[in-house]
Structure formats: structure tokens, C-alpha cells
A protein has these predicted regions:
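Residues forming the flavin
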Residues: 1-293
């Protein structure tokens, strides 16, 4: 884009387009951890999310790339990252793995040490899921080169001390004991959830959803970007949590699939419609959620 390509004064408007195919790539929303009371987000000054520390680390961010404590603006000496906040937790309705938290936590932990080599960093994890190309080597580098400490166990509670430092109580499942360590800054590695408004769009497109709220594909292996609605395709986190390489690959696949009916010019659709039997219908509307037609 050239200079002044973005019109900041533009107002919201509704337009109507006639299209042949649709690719739903609506992204995601980061999980809001304020509902997990024991972690104190929104109550404790020095408890932040991964998105907030990403903003700090960015050279064009408000701190010029330096990680600081929100309480006093000073650089923290001890930093803790808590993985799986808003993921793999059935108590809050998020039983799925977000697939990105482990790796972006290690990335941010390394950057903290790059900016301030004396920083002590600890990662609390349930399981390290370094599944992608080069990810296991990245995990090994975090341990051996950067000296990041990994504690296997999900923290039970965070306490704020009088000096605004934070004490994490957690069970180290490898040692089989409860630990309490104090940190200057705690970062909650939040998971991914379906974007706001995605359910309304899903109903408009006539697409089914999985139990976790993401759009359901026609077949997880054979048609991973197709839906049961002809002409509608899905890509990225709209279909389920995934990282950038997988999102890019799926976006390319969805574009290729969408190009097929466009190149043909016309498509024959199956004349299948759904009808309800008013004599036995209880008006529960469960069929609306389940029926692909």
C-alpha cells in the first residue's frame, strides 16, 4: 500500500456483494483471564497477559522493547510464565489445546533474557507440546542456552505481597511436592477462543460447529477446509486453534478449493432440504445446531 492508504476517518458501512464462494477466515479472540480469580489478573498490578508482554517486547511499543513492571516501570529480575491459561481446562469450558501457548511463551522468555541477560525466567507447564518443525530444538535451546527453568505443574494460586511481588503456589509433579516461589512479574500465556460474532456468522453461512465452538469441517482428513455448505470454505483459527504456518497453509488450501467452482462457472448442488414433523416436534431447536442442511 502507498502513503495514506488507510482512511482513519472512514465510518462503518454495510455493503452487499454477490459472490460465488466464501472463505471464512475470521481469526480468533485471546482468552480473557480475568475470570480465573486465583490468578489475579485485573487485580494484581504485575500480572499481565502474553499479549501485553508482546507489546512491551516490540521495538515500536510503548516501552521501546523493554520489559517493565507495570507497578513502577522498572525491569523485573524474576519473571514467570504460566502456560495453558484458558486451554486444557474443563472447569471453564476450554478442554482443547490452543497449540501456540508453549512456543510463544518460550519465544517471549528468550526475548526477555536477550533484552536483560540477568533476568531469571521460569515456565510453569502441564505438558510441552513442541510439535512443529524445529520446535523441539527451540525448546532445547530455551533450556540449555538460555537457562530457562521449567516446572511441570499448573499453579493453584498467585498471591500479591506487600511490595507488589507475586508468589506462585504450585505442585511440581516431577518432584511430587508443593512449591512457592516469588517473582517480580507473572505472564499468563492465554489460549485462543472463537472470535466474537463468529456464531452469528456461522448461522448466516449455514455452517456447523464443533463442541468447542469452532467451525466444523466436512471431513478432518479428506476435506479439512470444506464445509457441508456448498461454496463455503474455512481457514485458520476459524476451524480450530493453530499457529501461523498452519494458518497460512490452510488459507492457501481454502483459496485453491474455492477456485474450483469459480473456474467451472456453475455447480450442481444436492437438492437436499430439511423438514420437521410438526406432530412430534418439541421446538427444542437442537436440530438447528446439528443439521448440516
Amino acid at each position: 500500500c502507498g502513503p495514506d492508504a488507510i482512511d482513519h476517518n472512514q465510518e462503518a458501512s454495510e455493503i452487499e456483494l454477490e459472490v460465488g464462494t466464501i472463505v471464512a477466515a475470521i481469526g480468533y479472540d485471546p482468552f480473557d483471564p480475568s475470570g480465573i480469580y486465583q490468578y489475579g489478573y485485573g487485580r494484581y498490578t504485575n500480572v499481565i497477559t502474553a499479549m501485553e508482554i508482546e507489546r512491551m517486547i516490540n521495538a515500536s511499543g510503548p516501552t521501546g522493547g523493554h520489559v517493565i513492571k507495570p507497578s513502577d516501570g522498572l525491569e523485573p529480575k524474576r519473571v514467570a510464565f504460566i502456560h495453558c491459561v484458558g486451554s486444557r481446562d474443563e472447569t471453564i469450558g476450554k478442554p482443547y489445546c490452543s497449540r501456540v501457548c508453549c512456543m510463544y511463551s518460550m519465544k517471549n522468555a528468550q526475548l526477555c533474557i536477550d533484552h536483560e541477560p540477568d533476568t531469571e525466567v521460569t515456565c510453569y507447564y502441564m505438558d510441552i507440546r513442541a510439535f512443529g518443525k524445529g520446535y523441539e530444538e527451540f525448546y532445547k535451546t530455551s533450556q540449555e542456552k538460555y537457562g530457562i527453568e521449567f516446572i511441570r505443574g499448573k499453579p493453584a494460586q498467585i498471591f500479591e505481597n506487600d511490595d507488589l511481588t507475586l508468589t506462585i503456589r504450585a505442585e511440581d509433579t516431577l518432584l511430587g511436592k508443593v512449591t512457592e516461589y516469588t517473582y517480580d512479574l507473572v505472564v499468563l500465556s492465554v489460549g485462543l477462543e472463537h472470535a466474537e460474532g463468529s456464531d452469528e456468522l456461522r448461522q448466516t453461512l449455514g455452517v456447523s460447529k464443533s463442541a468447542d465452538g469452532f467451525y466444523m469441517e466436512a471431513h478432518p482428513k479428506l476435506r479439512p477446509v470444506d464445509t457441508l455448505t456448498d461454496g463455503v470454505y474455512i481457514a485458520g483459527v476459524a476451524q480450530g486453534p493453530k499457529d501461523i504456518p498452519d494458518s497460512v497453509a490452510q488459507g492457501s488450501a481454502a483459496a485453491s478449493r474455492a477456485a474450483i467452482p469459480m473456474a467451472q462457472g456453475q455447480v450442481e448442488i444436492e437438492p437436499i432440504i430439511a423438514a420437521n414433523d410438526e406432530a412430534i416436534c418439541g421446538a427444542c431447536e437442537v436440530c438447528v445446531e446439528l443439521c448440516p442442511y
